[in-house]
């Protein structure tokens, strides 16, 4: 895997490192009465409520309140959180080992479109499953809800490159 000019690798989280299934969240919302959830959110599109959550413009509690209102849900906040997190599956041990081996030859970074609710869930999963701090696998991990930027916008990638004086050709 070692390349002559490659010094840095920027990984994505969802669907690359962490297995995800968007349909599980849609199904979970349907079970609690959110039959129109897929009109608001899917793997390929989402409305502004989700965009704002991903770039940290709204708090998790506001997101939950607004989502309940949009879907006319009366369930508890924990039901909403569980449905929202249903898409988060597992992180296979082989991927963890791959990250550890790649780290020996390259600087590795993480750049993920995510939100605080999901972040808390997979951090807890990783700590419980592997007894490790997930972020320790990377030279630096960047999350959209923390940096206020989302992929595929160029400014998101530029932020990471500039933060570490990285050359995009490396």
Language model features with spans:
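Substrate-recognition "cap/lid" segment bordering the active-site pocket of phosphatases
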Residues: 116-170
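Short beta-strand/turn micro-motifs composed of small residues
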Residues: 112
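A structure-centric signal for secondary-structure junctions around beta-strands
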Residues: 5-6, 105, 138, 168
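Surface-exposed alpha-helical segments enriched in charged/polar residues
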Residues: 97-100, 162
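N-terminal helical cap/lid subdomain that shapes the substrate entry/recognition surface
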Residues: 2-97, 104, 115-121
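Short, structurally constrained coil/turn elements
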Residues: 102-104, 134
